[in-house]
Amino acid sequence: MTEYKKVIAQNKKALFNYFIEERLEAGIVLKGSEVQSLRQGKASIEESHATDTGHEVFLYNCHIAEYEKANRFNHATRRPRKLLLHTKEIKKIIGRIRIKGYTLVALSMYFNKKNKVKVELGIAKGKKLHDKRESIQEKDWKRDQSRLIRQK
């Protein structure tokens, strides 16, 4: 059975800049105007990342546009947002991202089947320039292969 996901925002750049070693799902604490703005699809997680502050994990640099109809009760667009994770998951994440070179990157934001906003996180290690070139060459080669197959 396929899981229902209404994708709000994706971070395609993260897949290019990082090796994603592990993926996990987290809830996120939002205000009402933020949820309404997300329903309209006005969000960007291009440069967002998560870090730990003691025993909690926060998502930074995630842009959720202001909701136009929430006049004076609007939210700050790039405020840090708390991620909802189990204690075991938090300890595991903290242990992994304390290792040099690892970071916690937001990969996508979506509504699940219960209409809750979820964030897909990835424990990632940064790619070097030559790794990025390899991934570009690999992508080009796959594109050329599909062209050759279509021509036959």
From Swiss-Prot:
For this UniProt entry, the molecular function terms from Gene Ontology, in alphabetical order, are: RNA binding
Q: What GO biological process terms does the UniProt entry carry, in alphabetical order?
A: trans-translation
Q: Which CDD domains match?
A: SmpB (cd09294)
Q: List the InterPro entries.
A: SmpB, SsrA-bd_prot, SsrA-bd_prot_CS
* UniProt KW keywords: Cytoplasm, RNA-binding
Q: Which Gene3D superfamilies match?
A: 2.40.280.10
Tell me which Pfam families the record gives.
SmpB (PF01668)
Q: Which GO terms describe its cellular component?
A: cytosol
Tell me where it mainly resides. cytoplasm
Question: Subcellular localization, per the record?
Answer: Cytoplasm
Similarity comment text for this entry: Belongs to the SmpB family.
Function statement:
Required for rescue of stalled ribosomes mediated by trans-translation. Binds to transfer-messenger RNA (tmRNA), required for stable association of tmRNA with ribosomes. tmRNA and SmpB together mimic tRNA shape, replacing the anticodon stem-loop with SmpB. tmRNA is encoded by the ssrA gene; the 2 termini fold to resemble tRNA(Ala) and it encodes a 'tag peptide', a short internal open reading frame. During trans-translation Ala-aminoacylated tmRNA acts like a tRNA, entering the A-site of stalled ribosomes, displacing the stalled mRNA.
What is the official name of this protein in its record? SsrA-binding protein
Species of the source: Rickettsia massiliae (strain Mtu5)
Gene, per the UniProt record? smpB
